[in-house]
Amino acid sequence: MFRCGGLAGAFKQKLVPLVRTVYVQRPKQRNRLPGNLFQQWRVPLELQMARQMASSGSSGGKMDNSVLVLIVGLSTIGAGAYAYKTIKEDQKRYNERVMGLGLSPEEKQRRAIASATEGGSVPQIRAPSHVPFLLIGGGTAAFAAARSIRARDPGARVLIVSEDPELPYMRPPLSKELWFSDDPNVTKTLQFRQWNGKERSIYFQPPSFYVSAQDLPNIENGGVAVLTGKKVVHLDVRGNMVKLNDGSQITFEKCLIATGGTPRSLSAIDRAGAEVKSRTTLFRKIGDFRALEKISREVKSITVIGGGFLGSELACALGRKSQASGIEVIQLFPEKGNMGKILPQYLSNWTMEKVKREGVKVMPNAIVQSVGVSGGRLLIKLKDGRKVETDHIVTAVGLEPNVELAKTGGLEIDSDFGGFRVNAELQARSNIWVAGDAACFYDIKLGRRRVEHHDHAVVSGRLAGENMTGAAKPYWHQSMFWSDLGPDVGYEAIGLVDSSLPTVGVFAKATAQDNPKSATEQSGTGIRSESETESEASEITIPPSAPAVPQVPVEGEDYGKGVIFYLRDKVVVGIVLWNVFNRMPIARKIIKDGEQHEDLNEVAKLFNIHED
C-alpha cells in the first residue's frame, strides 16, 4: 500500500503544475485517505461509491481502503500521463509552426508530403465520386490542359490524378538550370536562377493555387484539384469511370490521359545484380535529381549512358561541376558523336568536342555488353572489349510511354511509334483525349508522330483542353524543343529533326550575344518555349538587301551559329536553329507552308544570322 502511495506521490509532485485544471482542493476532512498523500479528486461515480463504502465501517476495513488507494493512484497516473502527452504534443505543434516560418509554399508542400509518407502512412484524402473533367497524370500536359479548360470554362471543376507525390512541375530545369545553382539548399527549395539572374521555382503554381479534391464538387466557381500519390489502374470507357489503386472509383464526363513515360533501362543493367541496380539512376523526376545531386558529392566517378538531349545535358552539368569537385564524369553512347540521331555528322562531332571541353570524358561508338561489380566499383564491359570502371551509372536512353490503361480501356497502341493512337484532335474515343509523351497523334503536315519534349506537352495539353471544351481543333501548331549544353551553346528545333534525312546547313560567325544566356536575358525566361510558342510569323518575305550567305562550312570549322534544314522530298520538314534565338516563328511558318525551295541559302536569310 505504501509503495503504491509513494509512487503516486512522486507523480503528483511532477504533475501538479500541469494538471491544476483537472482537480479541485476541498476543505480538510478528519477521515482522510490513509497515508495522507492525496488531495481529494473529482472522480467518477463508481469511485465515489467505493470511497463511501470504505468510510462507513463496512466489513473489509483496511483491505477496502487499500483497494481504493490503488484505484485512485492508478487514476492519478493515467490522468497525469494524458496531461503530459497533451502538453508535449501541443509543444511539438508549436515548434513545427515556428520552424515553418519563412519556408516557401513549395517547401512546405514537400515537407508535408515527406512527413505524411514516413513509415508508410499516407494521408487518406477522399476522392470525389464524380468530376466533369478528369486528367490522368500530373505532368506538364495535364497542367496545360487544366489551364486551357479553365480558360474556356471559368467554372470548370478539374481533377488531376497523379502518381507523382509532387504537384505539377516542369522537368527541363532538372537537367539544366538546377545544376548550375550556387544555392546549397537547391535540392530542398527547387528554386533556380535563370541565365538572366531571375529566380524561379520549377513548380507551375504554389499549393495555394489548387483546391482540395474533397471540396472540388462543392466549390461554386470550380477550380483545379490534384490527388498526388494516386494511380489510375482501370479505365472503363463506356461507363465513364476509373478505378484508383486505393480501390476508390471516379466517374467523369471528359477524360484526358497524360500518363507520360517511364525511363528506359538497358538490358545489360536489367540482367545485373541488385547492387548494380541500386547504383544506377534512371533520371526523370525530382527525386532522381535530389538523389543524383547527393551522389555527385559522395562518389569519385559517374558514368552517363546516352548521347541524346538528356544524356548530353546531364554530362555537361556534371562536367562543369567536376571542375570544382574533381569528380570524374564519363559519357558513353553507341553513336559517333553527341546527339548523333539529331544533328548531321559534322555538327555532332563538333558538339562532342564542346562537351569534352566541359570536363567530360566522352566515349562514342560504345555499346554496353554487361555491367558487374569488381573491387567495390562498377565494371562496364563494352562490346568492342573496352572496360569502364565507375562508382555510379546514370541512364538516359529515352522513354517508354505509359500505356497500361490501353488494355482495360480498349484503346489502340501504335505499333510503330508506341503510345496511344489518337486522331488530329488528340481523341482516342469520343470522351477520351491523350496528350504529351504518351500520345501518338496525326500531324496534318508531317504525318503520324510521337514527341517527347516539354513544349509538345504544353501544346498538346492545351489543345486537348480546348477540344475537351468543344473547340474541335486539329493539331497544326508545331511544337519546338531546345537543348542547352551549358550557358554558351544551345539550339532550338522544330519539326522532323532526324540525322538520317538530307540536311543543308548555313552558318555564320557567332557574336558574344549568340548563346543561351543572352537569349534568356532577352526573353525573360529560361523556358524558351514560353516566349516562342505563342508567336506566329504571318508572312515570309526574303529581304532584297540581305547580305549574301556563304557556302556551307566544311568539317573542322567553327559552327558559331547557323540554320540546319531537314528535307523530305525536297520539302523542309525540320529546322535546327544553332545558337540562333527568337526566330522560331519563322521556322514554324516555313514548315507550315510545306513548299519546295530552290535555294535554301535564300531561305536562311530570313533568320538574319549575319546581323551583329
From Swiss-Prot:
Keyword match Flavoprotein: yes
Compartment(s) where it occurs, according to its Swiss-Prot or TrEMBL record: Mitochondrion intermembrane space; Mitochondrion inner membrane; Cytoplasm; Nucleus
Motif (Nuclear localization signal): 445-450
Modified-residue entries (Phosphothreonine), positions: T520
Positions with a binding annotation for NAD(+) 1: G307, G308, F309, L310, E335, K341, G398, E452, H453, W482
GO terms of biological process kind: apoptotic mitochondrial changes; intrinsic apoptotic signaling pathway in response to endoplasmic reticulum stress; mitochondrial respiratory chain complex assembly; neuron apoptotic process; positive regulation of apoptotic process; positive regulation of necroptotic process; protein import into mitochondrial intermembrane space; regulation of apoptotic DNA fragmentation
Binding site for FAD: 137-141, 163-164, 171, 176, 232, 284, 437, 453-454, 482
Annotated effect of mutating K254A: Abolished DNA-binding without affecting binding to poly-ADP-ribose chains
Residues noted as binding NAD(+) 2 in the record, renumbered to the chain: W195, E492, N582
Motif (Mitochondrial localization signal): 1-30, 62-88
Effect of K176A: Increases catalytic efficiency
Tissues where the protein occurs: Expressed in cortical neurons (at protein level).
EC top class, as a word: oxidoreductase
GO CC entries: cytoplasm; cytosol; mitochondrial inner membrane; mitochondrial intermembrane space; mitochondrial outer membrane; mitochondrion; nucleus; perinuclear region of cytoplasm
Glycyl lysine isopeptide (Lys-Gly) (interchain with G-Cter in ubiquitin) cross-link site: K254
Residues with PTM N6-succinyllysine: K108
EC annotation from Swiss-Prot or TrEMBL: 1.6.99.-
Functional description taken from the UniProt entry: Functions both as NADH oxidoreductase and as regulator of apoptosis. In response to apoptotic stimuli, it is released from the mitochondrion intermembrane space into the cytosol and to the nucleus, where it functions as a proapoptotic factor in a caspase-independent pathway. Release into the cytoplasm is mediated upon binding to poly-ADP-ribose chains. The soluble form (AIFsol) found in the nucleus induces 'parthanatos' i.e. caspase-independent fragmentation of chromosomal DNA. Binds to DNA in a sequence-independent manner.
Subunit structure and binding partners: Monomer (oxidized form). Homodimer (reduced form). Upon reduction with NADH, undergoes dimerization and forms tight, long-lived FADH2-NAD charge transfer complexes (CTC) resistant to oxidation. Also dimerizes with isoform 3 preventing its release from mitochondria. Interacts with XIAP/BIRC4. Interacts (via N-terminus) with EIF3G (via C-terminus). Interacts with PRELID1. Interacts with CHCHD4; the interaction increases in presence of NADH.
Similarity comment text for this entry: Belongs to the FAD-dependent oxidoreductase family.
Name of the protein described by the UniProt record: Apoptosis-inducing factor 1, mitochondrial
Source organism (scientific name): Mus musculus
